[in-house]
Swiss-Prot record:
This is Galactinol--sucrose galactosyltransferase. Keywords: Carbohydrate metabolism, Glycosyltransferase, Transferase. GO terms for molecular function: galactinol-sucrose galactosyltransferase activity. It comes from Pisum sativum. It catalyses: alpha-D-galactosyl-(1->3)-1D-myo-inositol + sucrose = raffinose + myo-inositol. The gene is RFS. Belongs to the glycosyl hydrolases 36 family.
Length: 798
């Protein structure tokens, strides 16, 4: 018979789900007579209310090969057993918003992602239910090896027109907040508003669960099913911090020229907010200049879009050539022709057209109605935000969902005709605040994301989008059918907008933690984008190091002519490309359940993989972050001091990347420290103590050691040690054991370093013998730029 579901009449321990993973212990979820959720017989949520129900997943796991046992059902030799289950509840009253206790969480370490702003999430840890934050999007309970308890994931999802998040309840209860976003949309019975999943691997845990949810909902595609836009391989420049709303064609041109002249030509350019035609409701929509003169912080929020065409600053562009085109189309064409490195130009727009939406009753624009945003109880618990205050005060000109396609087509068709390659779609999670009269948040989101997806497929090759201000499960579960690149952290704040002078430093640690931990969840849907930074900021190198190994695009928002070219050249190649990792960076296991911002002892450690080596980044981010009492980010200077951690080759998830690396049989790794410029040989289980001052870093290239069987020569490529992601330069690697020959395909230029236990007889680059240095078992050879990103073939003969 089928595995039993939990109901309010359950009188014995019901096994909901079991899974056998190879030689690993059998994993099972059950509910005992005392109403406790158990994993392998050990409670993780206790005193579960009688109205909580569960159902098993209906399809075999796409990941695991299960073995039959007494709790499973065989069907044509395939079991229907799963390592997870869906959770629901019954109530007697149909409402638009339910807060439902799920069970008590006590004494188990957890890591979570919660919304601290309407549109941004971050990391939070604790051990008891009352320590949870409102608007929690994902909750992972730590495993206990001695008890045999695996990692447990609690993932709030969507059911019909309702969306779920987690929050703290009374007496350490974990509560589910299940809401429709409209008082007209009510419900009383839910079968699958939350998903529980088990795994002994925290990275597979989330990936597997997302696959199950995808099968259940059918409303999104995972990242591995999509192709991110080509800008992820490039260095870029964004106009935001350089100009804010005062961006203009001459400034964009001068910005690209300054970077190009300095040897760091951008491969893509983002023209941020400030190019559109907008106005306040009391401005004359014909002149439009009044709206464009509102450039102080917050002044643009009440403005609304009044035409698809660019504003007068870009519309009046002309290059002086009688035969040249004017306006945005002429500017983009001239920019790409003059600066050949620029392959893509993106522009910014809000999901609703502009911050204040679309202005009603404007000729040439779709119908729009000013809607007063309504904040849910969970959103009211987020951080105070000037943008939200201004938008609530002035309302949003919402284009009805049946006309969203017309709006996106209008914006995007004009941009496509002007030579624009993609869009940064911002202010995405404003939509949930506008859903009262439009069928609720889920239905309104479905309509808008369907229209956006259709337009992107039509005008921008299906993937020419950067999603921003999108941090909520509505977006990830409904809006990622085509979108494959998105921001995973709050904005880069060069200083604290609240005026704390120390924010110049501690906010940078916050940003890094946002991006690293959010990627654990978001990276299953979109390729993580760690946002821009400025190369002259006091923490610029700190930022650059994290971006270089993030696996995503790397771009800056430098003011025109104000650049640190020495730093830029540590991650930008002369053709505007970058040395990108194969995967996206994630926190290491030993800091998943720790607080790298304000416990004074935890180092943020992130791992990634290149083709032939791993990379481990160590960052001291301690010094400030979310404060539950004041419900805002604030300084915690008492924790801003030197931090010590242990680093090991084991910290790298060799089998969890996009292209897993087989290290079976590898006994020793050559580990190169970028800042210390030293190399150590380490066994996989070796641990090295590293201490870092506040807002400083170290990058470790971890390269498996190869041994020539003929002469027992040890060899490991490090890469270009002048580049932050040194190992990313090694693009091909071939060992000829019989000839004692190594061939390395190197991308980029600078100093190539390799470890070799013996001095090579000779070294050749593209068939020509070259000089090299050999000291302390390190071979160093200079690689010249070949004129493009084609590989230089470097040969070492022993």
């Amino acid at each position: 018979m089928a595995p039993p579901s939990i109901t309010k009449t359950a009188t014995q321990q019901d096994v909901i789900s079991t899974v056998d993973i190879g030689n690993s212990p059998l994993l099972s979820i059950s509910l005992d007579q005392s109403r406790n959720f158990l994993v392998n017989g050990h409670p993780f949520l206790t005193q579960v209310p009688p109205n909580i129900t569960t159902t098993t997943t209906s399809t075999p796991s796409p990941f695991l090969d299960f073995k039959s046992n007494k709790d499973t059902i065989a069907n044509n030799n395939n079991t229907l057993q799963q390592q997870g289950c869906f959770v629901g509840f019954n109530t007697t009253e149909a409402k638009s918003h339910h807060v439902v206790p799920l069970g008590k969480l006590k004494g188990i370490k957890f890591t979570s992602i919660f919304r601290f702003k309407v549109w941004w999430t971050t990391h939070w840890v604790g051990t008891n239910g009352h320590e949870l934050q409102h608007e929690t999007q994902i909750l992972i309970l730590d495993k206990n090896i001695s008890l045999g308890r695996p990692y447990v994931l609690l993932l709030p999802i969507l059911e019909n027109s309702f969306r779920t998040s987690l929050q703290p309840g009374l007496n350490d209860y974990v509560d589910m907040s299940v809401e429709s976003g409209s008082t007209h949309v009510t419900g009383s019975t839910f079968k699958a508003c939350l998903y529980l999943h088990l795994s002994n691997d925290p990275y597979r845990l989330v990936k597997e669960a997302v696959k199950v949810i995808q099968t259940k909902l059918g409303t999104f595609k995972t990242l591995e099913e999509k192709t991110p836009p080509s800008i992820i391989e490039k260095f870029g420049w964004c106009t935001w911090d350089a100009f804010y709303l005062k961006v203009h064609p001459k400034g964009v041109w001068e910005g690209v020229k300054a970077l190009t002249d300095g040897g760091c030509p951008p491969g893509f350019v983002i023209i941020d907010d400030g190019w559109q035609s907008i106005s306040h409701d009391d401005d004359d929509p014909v002149t439009e200049r009044d709206g464009m003169n509102r450039t102080s912080a917050g002044e643009q929020m009440p403005c609304r879009l009044i035409k698809y065409e660019e504003n007068y600053k870009f519309r009046e562009y002309e290059n002086g050539d009688n035969g040249g085109k004017k306006g945005l189309v002429g500017f983009v064409r001239d920019l790409k022709e003059e600066f050949r490195s620029v392959e893509s130009v993106y522009v910014w727009h809000a999901l609703c057209g502009y911050w204040g939406g679309v202005r009603p009753k404007v000729c040439g624009m779709p119908e729009a109605k000013v809607v007063v945003p309504k904040l849910s109880p969970g959103v009211k618990m987020t951080m105070e935000d000037l943008a939200v205050d201004k938008i609530v005060e002035n309302g949003v000109g919402l284009v009805p969902p049946n006309l969203a396609q017309e709006m996106f087509d209008g914006i995007h068709s004009h941009l496509e005709s002007a030579g624009i390659d993609g869009v940064k779609v911002d202010v995405i999670h404003l939509l949930e605040l506008l859903s009262e009269e439009y069928g609720g948040r889920v239905e309104l989101a479905k309509a808008y994301y369907k229209a956006l997806t259709s337009s992107v497929n039509k005008h921008f090759k299906g993937n020419g989008v950067i999603a921003s201000m999108e941090h909520c499960n509505d977006f990830f579960l409904l809006g990622t059918e085509a979108i494959s690149l998105g921001r995973v952290g709050d904005d880069f704040w060069c200083c604290d907008p609240s005026g704390d002078p120390n924010g110049t430093y501690w906010l940078q640690g916050c940003h890094m933690v946002h991006c690293a931990y959010n990627s654990l969840w978001m990276g299953n849907f979109i390729h993580p984008d760690w946002d821009m930074f400025q190369s002259t900021h006091p923490c610029a190198e700190f930022h650059a190091a994290s971006r270089a190994i993030s696996g995503g695009p790397v771009y800056v928002s430098d003011c025109v002519g104000n650049h640190n070219f020495k730093l830029l050249k540590s991650f930008v190649l002369p053709d505007g490309s970058i040395l990108r990792c194969q995967h996206y960076a994630l926190p290491t296991r030993d800091c998943l359940f720790e607080d790298p911002l304000h416990n004074g002892k935890t180092m943020l450690k992130i791992w990634n993989l290149n083709k032939y080596a791993g990379v481990l980044g160590l960052f001291n981010c301690q010094g400030g972050g979310w404060c539950p009492e004041t419900r805002r980010n604030k300084s915690a200077s008492e924790f801003s001091h030197a931090v010590t951690c242990y680093a090991s080759p084991e910290d790298i998830e060799w089998c969890n990347g996009k292209t897993p690396m087989d290290i079976k049989g590898v006994d020793v790794f050559a580990v190169y420290f970028f800042k210390e410029k030293k190399l150590s040989l380490m066994k996989c289980s070796d641990r090295l103590e590293v201490s870092l001052e506040p807002f400083s870093f170290e990058l470790m290239t971890v390269s498996p050691l190869k041994v020539f069987s003929k002469r027992l020569i040890q060899f490991a490529p490090i890469g270009l040690v002048n580049m932050l992601n040194s190992g990313g330069a090694v693009q091909s690697l071939e060992f000829d054991d019989s000839a004692s020959l190594v061939k390395i395909g190197v991308r980029g230029c600078g100093e190539l370093s390799v470890f070799a236990s013996e001095k090579p007889v000779c070294c050749k680059i593209d068939g020509v013998s070259v000089e090299f240095d050999y000291e302390d078992k390190m071979v160093r050879v200079q690689i010249l730029w070949p004129g493009s990103s084609t590989l230089s073939l470097v040969e070492f003969l022993f």
